[in-house]
Amino acid sequence: KESLYLFLLQKREENELSKAFTAYNTRIITPPTGDNKPVAPVRRNIMLVAFVLGFLIPVVIIFVRENMNTTVRGRKDLKNMNVPFLGEIPYYVSRKYRPTLEQRIRFWKKPKEVRQMVVKAGKRDIVNEAFRVLRTNFEFTIGTHPEQTVIIFTSLNPGSGKSHLAANMAMSLAIKKKKVLLIDGDLRHGSTSMLVGNPGEGLSDYLNGRIADIHDILHKGEESGLVKYFDVIPIGTIPPNPTELLFTPLLEQMIRQMRQEYDYVFIDCPPIEVVADTPIYEQFADRTIFVVRSGLMERSMLPEIDALYKEKKFKNMTMILNGTKTRGGRYGSHYGYGYGYGYGYGYNY
């Protein structure tokens, strides 16, 4: 016990000496301070990072989207083509048409075709101005060949807007008192026939012999809610054998007769890559207007149109670019969803 006591006493003395030594060599260099504000997170840094990310993410998305977009977007995509360029029509959505969010998502990659007459006498919006330019170019092209009065409208893709263009171009000419006949040659779809209410009798009924006189299926413009000098032949009954029906001699006879009665005969044909009807109409036509839809046709398909032109598969072929979204370009401003641009002068059209 004595030894244990001496051991503990020794340890106590050593501990006292150690405490005295440590206290002697320790001193406060900087007194401790405190702050009511947190050290982290720093709000300024967070806002700076958020601003940078908010700027960079949209830029990256736009860059990727633009580089992944392989469709025709404007006139510059057609600059290397050999096909004569007739004109362009800007993208247009009716004031009455208000697409829902679901419709905008559904048709994001495939623009909705406007199925209405936008050309009207005296209107000064950007679309009417574009059709005036198109009409002027068309008349200038036809001017040296006045006998070329039968024109077909076609495209590579469905939904290119050729029916809409053919109808409004016909209206533009009719306002100038040119007699124009628009024939709905798409015996499977019949978009143009909607202009006259899609009646039950039309071109197919004449070609199969059920209607003897072509004038019985001819709808006068002033009687159909259009204008004078603008007449329409609808498709009538949709036949089970459209292509075979076109081989009848009555088709050539009808076109020859209408050529004598009208200044221009427009034929709205199906897309050439869908059915074989268009080459049949082309035999009796003088000119071909090819419609390219901006945002729909792939740029990789443009050489196919050039090949058709070089190989002379279609007579006197020209091209129209439809649905261009102009932003500060030749038409002055972007046009869409009911926005109009007015000029300070008037037209009788």
Describe each region flagged by the PLM.
Residues 29, 89, 233:
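Hydrophobic residues at beta-strand termini and immediately following loops
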Residues 204-207, 232-277:
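Switch II (G3) loop of P-loop NTPases
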Residues 182, 232, 267, 290, ...:
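Structural beta-sheet core signal
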Residues 42-179, 185-204, 208-215, 220-224, ...:
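Short boundary/hinge segments that flank catalytic cores
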Residues 45, 231, 263, 286, ...:
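Conserved acidic residues
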Residues 257-260, 274-295:
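Inter-motif core of Ras-like GTPase G domains
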Residues 1-36:
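Non-transmembrane alpha-helical coiled-coil
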